[in-house]
């Protein structure tokens, strides 16, 4: 009983301090998330290689990928890859690694994870190699981070971004295109 009273007292103290801090700073917990457009990028894809019933590997082709935005522009170079894990729910969990060479020669490593949830219709279209757009896929969000030694792009080392799929096509002429936003 004594431990329960102490635990309640500690909880009340911590809660009071948190509420007092919010009142002093004028910053209550906010659920608003702001984003800033960073770039659009496109990466050409090979057909997936099924490793087993739950793992697909998609090779990012060595040429043809690009990134364009107000503060950054370049092309994707090797190495790059896209691992897709099929979850028991049917959702796909992504693990992607890519290298961007900017137009001024800087190298930026991009790594992201995310989730794709297909509807029966979007899965069928994807399996047929048809073009899918944002409106076709119920949920396709990834969260990239960046690493670079370039002083010009060092600010990327300190931001979290989100990708929203724009287009996806598998099979012949396959590619993925994202709009990328910095989370503020």
Language model segments and positions:
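Beta-strand-enriched cores of mature, soluble protein domains
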Residues: 28-184
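Bacterial N-terminal signal peptides
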Residues: 9-22
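N-terminal secretory signal peptides that target proteins for export/translocation
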Residues: 1-7
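Sec/Tat signal peptide C-region and signal peptidase I cleavage site
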Residues: 22-28
């Amino acid at each position: 009983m004594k431990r329960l009273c102490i635990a309640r007292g500690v909880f009340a103290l911590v809660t009071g301090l948190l509420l007092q801090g919010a009142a002093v700073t004028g910053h209550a917990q906010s659920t608003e998330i702001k984003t800033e457009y960073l770039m659009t990028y496109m990466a050409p894809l090979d057909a997936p290689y099924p490793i087993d019933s739950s793992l697909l590997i998609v090779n990012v082709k060595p040429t043809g990928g690009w990134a364009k935005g107000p503060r950054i522009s370049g092309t994707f170079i090797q190495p790059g890859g896209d691992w897709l894990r099929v979850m028991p729910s049917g959702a796909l969990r992504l693990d992607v690694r890519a290298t961007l060479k900017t137009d001024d020669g800087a190298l930026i490593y991009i790594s992201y994870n995310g989730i794709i949830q297909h509807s029966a219709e979007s899965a069928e279209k994807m399996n047929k190699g048809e073009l899918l757009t944002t409106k076709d896929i119920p949920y396709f969000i990834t969260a990239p981070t960046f690493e670079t030694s370039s002083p010009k792009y060092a600010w990327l080392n300190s931001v979290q971004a989100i990708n929203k799929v724009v287009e996806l096509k598998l099979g012949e002429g396959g590619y993925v295109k994202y709009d990328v936003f910095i989370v503020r």
